[in-house]
A protein has these predicted regions:
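CRL adaptor-proximal regions
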Residues: 2-18, 34-113, 554, 558-560
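Leucine-rich repeat
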Residues: 61-75, 79-86, 90-319, 329
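C-terminal closing repeat unit and adjoining cap/tail of repeat-based domains
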Residues: 67-77, 444-560
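Conserved hydrophobic position(s) of the canonical leucine-rich repeat
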Residues: 192, 223, 250, 275-278, ...
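Solvent-exposed loop/turn tips at the surfaces of repeat/solenoid architectures
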Residues: 200, 231, 253-258, 278-283, ...
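Short, solvent-exposed loop/turn at the beta-strand->alpha-helix junction
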Residues: 203-209, 233-238, 259-264, 284-289, ...
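A structural signal for leucine-rich repeat
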Residues: 242-247, 266-274, 291-299, 315-323, ...
């Protein structure tokens, strides 16, 4: 290989530490949680376009798959799901650069002189197709890729290779990529750092047999991260192979538009002993017993994520001594009970949809039991949720006793509706359950009466979707006058309600601070922002909620 390499193929997320070599030291593992999230309002906009459970689970043959309305519905759902998935471990979009220096012995193959461990490290940072091509460089390189830890993505094996998970792949392209995956799994000895299989249908009989072979290969060859995303036509009535539970090296697992393996009858040893992150995106399960089984058999699980509709809606019981973050985004669940999760600091429930026509009416019940480490909770919405703390149902006018308080929570996000009288009455009772809150995020609200966390602890208030209505201004006025510790007030304007942020800022300042001395909470800094809309509004990603290097994942909207 002529020349001296001074650049390398870059990726959005290096796989260096995820593909260890035998002797060479690996650089510190970069956090896999690197993508920005969106405000809850923009997340709701994206989520509202997600297809309904009926349209997704409807058996779709070749004729129905051509239905333009069904295709559009599934495409929107896939687009929403894909935004929740982790970034690729390696990239086909990186650049490879080199320079030739005659003074430094140009033309001499210096890379081939490196130890095998370092060469395997080089190959492991390449997409599978490029990694295989290194065998053609010289005799020295031929055996390297066969023993290098690989990142295998079928999207990289498409004729038009891409990092993105495509919402539509032609049958010919999907078959070609699947054939390439089969060849790689047959000849490569492993290990596989990551396998992302997302470009083909997994429901047809031939595809199911092929998937079973793939999973067997990956289990034997120690895959560490696995993403399985089904493509239309979707049926969801056939279970994934139970081979999934033989992948004992798995640390991260994401499934989308698939039916979870039946857990009844699995051998006693079936488990995910190293699994740290599990994401279920529009997945069908036999019932809450399957989820209970997964939690019980995943002793290292730290992050649990739900995106899109679960079939059927789950009764989620959180019993885990390892869980640190649970996120539920636009997913219908009947209830979320934190039964025993002593190490859980984050519970994020966003945009859970209301019951649709023909469904049993009622809210998703959120019960907080043994969660002494819980520090962040939101977005709670009384139109969608009912709250229970211990054995106490929290309703408007509830006299909150010590047993109904969660003093560990420091960051709280709420969604209250000014024009709904019951919401306005509910807010004071709800806030009294969280007496130590320091950072409060509100999507429309109303209140009254003395509240400990408001008076003594809240330092930051972020108010989303401000429209300038009298009820909104009255709430902000109450809050500013009551909150003795308030340091920053951030008002995020709803799109199209003001000609400029200056107009909105003037209206807020006039209502809150006009004629008042700069004393007490009047010293709080006011920041008025314009809400991002449309394509400029980033989508909520689980990577942000699970990134513990960020003290407050909701704070992305607040400039620091």
């Amino acid at each position: 290989m002529a020349g001296q390499v001074v650049g390398s193929r870059n990726s959005r997320r290096s796989s260096a530490a995820r593909c260890p070599t035998s002797t060479a030291p690996s650089p510190p593992r970069p956090s896999p949680l690197t993508t920005a999230a969106s405000a809850s309002s923009s997340a709701r906009t994206a989520a509202s376009s997600t297809a309904s459970p009926t349209s997704i689970t409807r058996p779709t043959g070749r004729g129905s798959a051509r239905d333009p309305h069904l295709i559009a519905s599934i495409s929107r759902a896939l687009s929403t799901i894909h935004r929740a998935l982790p970034s690729p471990a390696v990239s086909v979009e990186g650049r490879l650069s080199c320079t030739v220096s005659d003074s430094d012995g140009g033309g001499v193959d210096r890379l081939s002189a490196l130890p095998d461990a370092l060469l395997r490290g080089v190959v492991s940072r390449l997409p599978a197709k490029d990694a295989a091509r290194t065998a053609a460089l010289s005799r020295r390189w031929r055996p390297v890729w066969l023993s290098a830890p690989l990142v295998l993505s079928d999207a990289h094996l498409l004729p038009a290779a891409t990092d993105a998970i495509p919402s539509h792949v032609s049958r010919a392209d999907a078959d070609a990529a699947a054939a390439a995956v089969s060849r790689v799994l047959a000849v490569h000895d492993g290990p596989f750092c990551c396998a992302s299989l997302a470009c083909g249908n997994m429901d047809e009989d031939r595809a199911r047999a092929r998937l079973a072979r793939w999973l067997q290969h990956l289990a034997v060859k120690g895959v560490e991260e696995l993403l399985l995303i089904n493509q239309p036509p979707l049926q969801l009535h056939k279970h994934l192979p139970a081979t999934l539970f033989s992948m004992t090296a798995l640390t991260r697992l994401y499934l989308s538009f698939l039916r979870f393996p039946a857990t009844a009858g699995l051998p006693r040893g079936a488990a995910f002993p190293r699994l740290r992150e599990l994401g279920l995106c529009s997945v069908a399960m036999g019932g809450h017993e399957d989820m209970d089984f997964v939690l019980a058999r995943s002793p290292a699980l730290e992050a649990l994520c739900f995106e899109g509709h679960m079939f059927p809606p789950l009764r989620l019981r959180l019993v885990s001594r390892s869980l640190r973050c649970v996120q539920i985004h636009y997913s219908k669940v009947k209830s979320v009970a934190v039964v025993d999760a002593p190490c859980l600091p984050r519970l994020i429930v966003m945009n859970t949809p209301l019951r649709g026509e023909g469904e049993v009416e009622g809210s998703c019940r959120i019960k907080i039991g043994n969660a002494p480490s819980l520090q962040l909770f939101g977005y709670f919405d009384p139109a969608r949720h009912a709250l229970q703390v211990g054995n106490n149902d929290i309703k408007a006018g509830t006299l909150v006793s010590a047993g109904a308080m969660v003093p560990s929570v420091k960051i709280l996000a709420l969604e209250f509706h000014f024009r709904v009288r019951s919401d306005a009455k509910m807010l004071p009772s709800f806030l009294r359950c969280f007496p130590s809150v320091e950072r409060l995020y509100i999507q429309q609200a109303a209140s009254g009466a003395a509240i400990e966390c408001v008076e003594l602890h809240v330092k930051l208030l972020v108010f989303h979707d401000f429209r300038g209505e009298k009820a909104e201004l009255a709430f902000l006025q109450f809050f500013v006058e009551s909150a003795r510790a308030l340091e920053r007030l951030v008002v995020v304007c709803a799109g199209g309600c003001f000609a400029s942020t200056d107009e909105a800022s003037s209206k807020v300042r006039k209502a809150l601070f006009a004629g008042k001395k700069e004393t007490g909470s009047g010293r709080c800094a006011l920041l008025v922002l314009e809400n991002a809309t449309g394509k400029d509004a980033p989508a909520w990603k689980y990577e942000r909620g699970s990134d513990f290097s960020r003290a407050d994942p909701f704070a992305f909207i607040v400039p620091t």
